[in-house]
Amino acid sequence: MRSSILFLLKLMKIMDVQQQQEAMSSEDRFQELVDSLKPRTAHQYKTYYTKYIQWCQLNQIIPTPEDNSVNSVPYKDLPISAELIHWFLLDTLITDDKPGEKREETEDLDEEEENSFKIATLKKIIGSLNFLSKLCKVHENPNANIDTKYLESVTKLHTHWIDSQKAITTNETNNTNTQVLCPPLLKVSLNLWNPETNHLSEKFFKTCSEKLRFLVDFQLRSYLNLSFEERSKIRFGSLKLGKRDRDAIIYHKVTHSAEKKDTPGHHQLLALLPQDCPFICPQTTLAAYLYLRFYGIPSVSKGDGFPNLNADENGSLLQDIPILRGKSLTTYPREETFSNYYTTVFRYCHLPYKRREYFNKCNLVYPTWDEDTFRTFFNEENHGNWLEQPEAFAFPDKIPFDFKKIMNFKSPYTSYSTNAKKDPFPPPKDLLVQIFPEIDEYKRHDYEGLSQNSRDFLDLMEVLRERFLSNLPWIYKFFPNHDIFQDPIFGNSDFQSYFNDKTIHSKGSPILSFDILPGFNKIYKNKTNFYSLLIERPSQLTFASSHNPDTHPTQKQESEGPLQMSQLDTTQLNELLKQQSFEYVQFQTLSNFQILLSVFNKIFEKLEMKKSSRGYILHQLNLFKITLDERIKKSKIDDADKFIRDNQPIKKEENIVNEDGPNTSRRTKRPKQIRLLSIADSSDESSTEDSNVFKKDGESIEDGAYGENEDENDSEMQEQLKSMINELINSKISTFLRDQMDQFELKINALLDKILEEKVTRIIEQKLGSHTGKFSTLKRPQLYMTEEHNVGFDMEVPKKLRTSGKYAETVKDNDDHQAMSTTASPSPEQDQEAKSYTDEQEFMLDKSIDSIEGIILEWFTPNAKYANQCVHSMNKSGNKSWRANCEALYKERKSIVEFYIYLVNHESLDRYKAVDICEKLRDQNEGSFSRLAKFLRKWRHDHQNSFDGLLVYLSN
C-alpha cells in the first residue's frame, strides 16, 4: 500500500514538471538549456555550432542572411542531421586539418597526443551539434533529427584507426619480435599466394585456384567486414565500378522491408580499393581467381568459361552467378566448407583464430541509410554546390570518405583529391587484350545490344584486368611456379620482357618496391622480414634471401634504396654483380628456350602424322619444357662450383694455369678471384678454357693496378669486370644453347626413327596378314581406343597406356555377338589360324596379372602365344570351352573391363585416367580384384544395370 502511494506521488510530480515545461515559453526553455552548461563549455559549443552554420551557408544548404549577421542563428529552419554533421566533420576537421596551425596551438604535443587531441575534438564537435539540435527542437524545427547511432559509428571508426596505429607504434618500440606485429591479412594472403605449400592440407587446397577462392572470401571479410551470410549474397551483377573514383569497386547492398518486399528499405554501400602490395590487393586476387575460374589450369582442370553476356538480355544472368563458385555455377560455397578452410589456413600460418570474427557480423561496419534519408540526402536540389566540385565531395559514390579509407587500411587524414600512386610502368595495351579477350570482343560487336548489367560487368572486368596485369610481374618474381603461369600466353617473349622490365630495378635492393600497410612499412618493406612471413619459402626466394648482402639495412639505406649499394665495399659489390649476372643468364636461357620450344610445338602441330604420334611428341616437348624450367630455376652458382670440383680433368687444367702465373707470391696475397661458371650440364673443354681465360685476365688487371691506391683499383676492377661479364655471358649462352640443341636433335631423331619404324611395321603387318607376330617385339602392345580429351579429373594419372580406336559398346558374352569397333580387327585368315591353333594350345587367362592395365591389355591385345588371340577375339569366335577352367576369373575381370569401357565411352575420360580411377577404386577395396568386381556388380544391380553416379561417389 505504501509503495503504491509513493508511485502515485512520483507520477504526479512528473506530470507537474511536464505541465510547467509546457507552460514555459520557448525562450525560457532555450535559456534553461543554455544555463545547464558550464560557461566554458557553452562558449566552446557556440564556437563549434557557429562554424557549422557558416559551413551550411558556404555550401548553399541554407541561404546566407542579407545583413551578414554572425550572431543570428536560424534555429527554426536550420537543417541538422547525422549525415550533415559527418559531412561537416570531413570538410573541416578530418580532411581539412592543417598541421602547421595545429602545431602552433599544441607545440608540446607529440604524434600520439596529437591523435588523442583529434579524437577529443571530434567528440566535442559532435556534442556541441547534439546540443544545437536540442536548441532547434525548442524552436519546433522539423529538420532537427539526429541519428545518434550513426555518429557513434563515426567516433568508433576513428578511435579504432588511431588506436590500431598507436598499438603498432608501441609494439614496434617495445617488442623485438616482428612476428607479433604481423597483421593476419598480410601473412595469410602471402602464404595463400605461395604455390609451394607442401604442409597445407591437400584435402582442401589441391590447386592454386582453390587457394585464391578462399583468399577472395578472406579479403572480402577483411576489407568489407561482412558476415559470411552477407558475403554469400554478392553476385557478379552486384559489383559496379565507381563513377567518381574509377579505381574503386562498389558493392551496393539493398535490403527490403518485410511489409513491402519490392520497395528498398535500407541501403549500404561498400568499396574495395586497390593496394600497393599485390598480395593483399583484393582487386588483383579477384582477377586472378576469375582468370583460373574462367579458363582453368592447363593439363589440370577446365574452366567454366567467360559468362555469355548475349544470353543476359534482362541482366538476370549476372545476378544469379555468385562471386565465388560452389558445387554449381549458381551456388556460393557452403559455410561448413569455408569453416574448415579458415581453421586449416590459420593453423598453417600459426595465427590465433576465432570463428565468430570471420563468420558473424562485425561491430565496425559501413553506415546504413534508410530509404527516405538516402533519397533526400543525395538529392541534387538539396545539396547542389558539391556537384560543381565532385572531386572534393565527402561522399564519393555515396560512400563516406573516411569509411572508405579506413576500411581499406588507408589513412583518412588527407585531402579528397589525393590519388593513388601512378604506375611508372603501365601495362601495354597489346598485352592487355590477351587477358580476358572476351571483353574486347563484346565491345567490338553489339556492345549497345547488351543489358546495362552486362556493360557494367565489362567495365568492371576492364579495371580488374588492368590491375591484374600491373601486379603480375611481382607475382611472377615471387612465385613463378604459380598455376597462372601455366597458361602459355604468359610464357611468350612479350610478357616475359614486361615482367623483367618492371621488376629489374628492385634487384639488389634490400627494400621492396611497393608499400605494405600503414604502420608496417618500416618493418616489412625490408625483404628479409617480408620473406620471413612465408611458412614455406619457394626455392628462388630461399636462394635470393641467403645471398642478400644487407639483411638489416639502416634507415638511410631504406630511404636511398639502390643508390646506397654503390657505396658498398668491393667484396659485397663483387658478390652482387656475380648474383645479378647469374640471374640474367638464367632469365635469358629460360626465355630463349621457351621461344624455341613454342616454335617446335607449332611445327609438329602443322606436320601430317598420326594423331597419337603427334600427341606423344607434343607431350614429350612439354615434359622437356617443365624439366628444363625446373632445372634452370633451381640451379645455383654453387652447383657449378661443385660440378667443376668433381671433374678431375678440369681440376688439372686449372692447376696448370695457376702454376703458369708470372708472380706466385704476389697472387697468394690477393683476395679470392671471382669465377663466373657455366650453368650448362656439359663438361666440355670450352667451359674450362673460358674459365681459365677469365682467370688470366683478372690476374693481369690486378698486376697492372697493384701500385695504385685502393679507390682507383676498385673503379678499374669494376669496369673490367663489367666488360668481362658481358663477354662471358655471350660465350656461355651460345655454348649452352649449342649443347642443348645437340641433345634435343638426338632426342628428336630417335623419336622420329621410332615412329617410322612403327609405321613401317604396321604396313608390313597389313600386307603380310598373319605374320604380325614376327614384328611384335618392335612395338608396345596397343589398346584399340581413340585418344580422348583430358577432362581434368582430380587424380594424378600415371601416363602408361597408349591406345588407339574407340569402343562402340560395352563388353558382352559371345552369345550376344556384339562387335566392338577396333582399328585392327583380325582378318578371316587369322580367325582360321586361331581356330586351328587353339586345338593345339588352348587359350587361357594369365592368373599372374596384378594390375588393371594388365587386365585391359590381356582383354584386347592379340597374344602371339595363342595365335594372336585375345579375350575379345575369343568371345567373338563363339568358342566358350576355354573358360571352363577359369570361369570365376573371367567374370571377375569382365566386370572390371566393363567399368573401364564405361569410363572411356560414356564419361569421355582419357584412357590413362580411366585406368587410374580403376586402380584407385581397387585400393579402396583392399587392393583385391575380386572385391572390386563384387563392388562393381553390386553398384550396377542397385543402379538399374548402369555405372551412373559412381564417379560422383568417388570424387566425394
Swiss-Prot record:
PTM-bearing positions, type Phosphoserine: S566
One of the GO BP terms on file: kinetochore assembly
Compartments where located: Nucleus; Chromosome, Centromere; Cytoplasm, Cytoskeleton, Microtubule organizing center, Spindle pole body
Broad class of the protein's primary localization: nucleus
Alphabetized Gene3D superfamilies for the sequence: 1.10.150.130, Centromere DNA-binding protein complex CBF3 subunit, domain 2
Biased composition (Polar residues): 819-829
GO molecular function, one term: centromeric DNA binding
Region (Disordered): 544-564, 653-672, 679-715, 810-837
Keyword line: Centromere, Chromosome, Cytoplasm, Cytoskeleton, DNA-binding, Nucleus, Phosphoprotein
Domain of life: Eukaryota
One cellular component (GO) term of this entry: nucleus
Residue positions, PTM Phosphotyrosine: Y706
Biased composition (Basic and acidic residues): 549-559
Subunit structure: Component of the CBF3 copmplex, which is formed of CBF3A/CBF2, CBF3B/CEP3, CBF3C/CTF13 and CBF3D. CBF2 strongly interacts with BIR1. Interacts with the central kinetochore protein CTF19.
Note, other: Present with 1350 molecules/cell in log phase SD medium.
Task of the protein: Acts as a component of the centromere DNA-binding protein complex CBF3, which is essential for chromosome segregation and movement of centromeres along microtubules. CBF3 is required for the recruitment of other kinetochore complexes to CEN DNA. It plays a role in the attachment of chromosomes to the spindle and binds selectively to a highly conserved DNA sequence called CDEIII, found in centromers and in several promoters.
Protein name: Centromere DNA-binding protein complex CBF3 subunit A
Organism lineage string: Eukaryota, Fungi, Dikarya, Ascomycota, Saccharomycotina
